[in-house]
Amino acid sequence: MAVIQITSDDTWQIQADGHPLRGTLQVPGDKSISHRALMLGAMAEGTTQITGLLVGEDTCSTASCFRALGAEISPLNATAVTVQGLGMGRLQEPGDVMNAGNSGTTMRLLLGVLAAQTGRFFTLTGDASLRSRPMARVVTPLLQMGAQIWGRQHHSRAPLAILGQPLEPITYYSPIASAQVKSALLLAALHTEGTTLIREPHRSRDHSERMLQAFGARLSVDEATCTVSLEGPAVLKGQKVIVPGDISSAAFWLVAASIIPDSELLLTNVGVNPTRTGILDVLWAMGAEITLENERLVTGEPVADLRVRSARLKSTRIGGELIPRLIDEIPILAVAAAFAEGVTEIRDAAELRVKESDRLKAVATELQKMGAKVTELSDGLDIQGGGPLQGTHLETYGDHRMAMSLAIAALNAKGTSEIHNASAAAVSYPEFVTVLQQIA
């Protein structure tokens, strides 16, 4: 068995021994769906019941903000959460600054909601990482709708102040495929008189569209043109929401079982929404042995059990319209590439530079420390795979996906690795290291 220890200074020590991974796992609830269930539940009339919610730092930030806005949300847990909604346009003006923590989803989607709360004033901030992340991509189209938003660097950085206004519908051609931009505008459009149309260059994840329709919004999607239209004003009704497991969390185990010989894992109840399954398409292209079992539809979302067995991986190219479907999985795919035969090329991923860390730089730096041959490009990486990695001192940059990706790399490296600032994993997967200790 691998030796995995958690030290008092927020460090994971991982000494690998090549032991195969075996077992059945249930990954935590989908983070994107969990955020949206809390938000729509707070804006809807009546009660929303949520099963399978992710209880992580990001979703706790969303719950905290909406409690400050007057919504009644029961203590967060994965079994059952109840949200007593206030109804459209009835969120209350809080008496203090709201803090989105590290959660870009919380801040960007909240901007769309708050901009439409006529006559009420809000201030929104976050941690140091979030305050450095770009908000203009959401603020700019909201200003076109009539929003009043102020902030640092020409209203592009938090803290941000919002004075709710009567908004107008718009037609917006987004320069990037971003579910956060699209969702913020849809949440604002719920309060307008008329039809808002949003077109993207590629499809982005569509959890907002699916859930808005379930809550009663008049929304249509043209997949051929990557266009969404919403007719406002809307009246949302509370719903029962079952949150599937997060494929972004499952990705770590899919790669781990693929690269560690003689491994086999069954990941149950994982969301396989086609706007999120780029990770599967890439791993299949690399030769991974992954099968979908017990496929079904749960509250409007495709769900399956994923069985993964170890396989000999080969290099591939990742870019173009694939990127929005796996943007969060690129760090762990880079780990897979380090163990694959040949050179894997990642392109069109400049968005990774403005995530919780500069993930292109972080991935290149840390894998190079382990002996991988990685070339950092402006919008991607070239990774020469096939060589053994060596355990060493590694840094997460306070980024949850970096912490877990490096842990999987360390699990198949020679010697001992120390991963510093590892508690960042709690943002999306608080139980990750416990599960790692159990199966490794």
Curated annotation (Swiss-Prot):
Q: Does the keyword Amino-acid biosynthesis apply?
A: yes
| One GO-annotated biological process of the protein | amino acid biosynthetic process
Q: Which amino acids does the record list as binding phosphoenolpyruvate? A: 31, 104, 133, 180, 359, 401
* Record keywords: Amino-acid biosynthesis, Aromatic amino acid biosynthesis, Cytoplasm, Transferase
Q: Where in the cell is it found?
A: Cytoplasm
Pathway in which this enzyme or protein is active: Metabolic intermediate biosynthesis; chorismate biosynthesis; chorismate from D-erythrose 4-phosphate and phosphoenolpyruvate: step 6/7
Enzyme class, UniProt record, top EC level: transferase
One Gene Ontology term of the molecular function aspect = 3-phosphoshikimate 1-carboxyvinyltransferase activity
The record, for Gene3D superfamilies, names: Enolpyruvate transferase domain
| Principal subcellular localization | cytoplasm
Q: Which reaction does it catalyse?
A: 3-phosphoshikimate + phosphoenolpyruvate = 5-O-(1-carboxyvinyl)-3-phosphoshikimate + phosphate
Supply the EC number(s): 2.5.1.19
* InterPro entries for the chain: Enolpyruvate_Tfrase_dom, Enolpyruvate_Tfrase_sf, EPSP_synthase, EPSP_synthase_CS, RNA3'P_cycl/enolpyr_Trfase_a/b
**Catalytic residue list:** 328
Checking Pfam families in the record gives: EPSP_synthase
Q: Which residues bind 3-phosphoshikimate?
A: 31-32, 36, 178, 180, 328, 355
Q: Tell me which GO cellular component terms the UniProt record holds.
A: cytoplasm
- Is Transferase there in the keyword field? yes
Assembly and binders: Monomer.
Entry's PANTHER family? AROM/DEHYDROQUINATE SYNTHASE (PTHR21090), PENTAFUNCTIONAL AROM POLYPEPTIDE (PTHR21090:SF5)
Q: Which family does it belong to?
A: Belongs to the EPSP synthase family.
Q: What does this protein do?
A: Catalyzes the transfer of the enolpyruvyl moiety of phosphoenolpyruvate (PEP) to the 5-hydroxyl of shikimate-3-phosphate (S3P) to produce enolpyruvyl shikimate-3-phosphate and inorganic phosphate.
Q: What's the protein called, per UniProt? A: 3-phosphoshikimate 1-carboxyvinyltransferase
Species of origin reads Thermosynechococcus vestitus (strain NIES-2133 / IAM M-273 / BP-1)
